[in-house]
Amino acid sequence: MKEVDARGLSCPEPLMLTAEALKNANGPIKVLVSEHHQKTNIEKFAKDKGNKATSTEKVSEFEIVIE
């Protein structure tokens, strides 16, 4: 599974990195972000593109798996 580590990055970088990873992915990707609004934006983006997004909150970060 490809991983995008966008922790500590400012918007719109996490979304741009996620979009690029999805474009080049052959399977699920995992995205790590540190802000709640980034998690929300990435989940919405994934769903708008027809993908399933599942998120988990970990200590001071969020993990989103996009399938």
Annotate the PLM regions.
Residues 1-25:
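An N-terminal amphipathic alpha-helical segment
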Residues 13-20, 36-49:
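Amphipathic alpha-helical interaction surfaces in cytosolic regulatory modules
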Residues 22-34:
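Short glycine-rich, basic-tinged beta-strand/loop micro-motifs
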Residues 1, 28-30, 61:
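Intrinsic-disorder/low-complexity, polar/charged segments enriched in Ser/Thr/Lys/Arg/Asp/Glu/Gln
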Residues 26, 37, 59-61:
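A generic structural motif
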Residues 41-67:
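C-terminal structural segments of small proteins and small subunits
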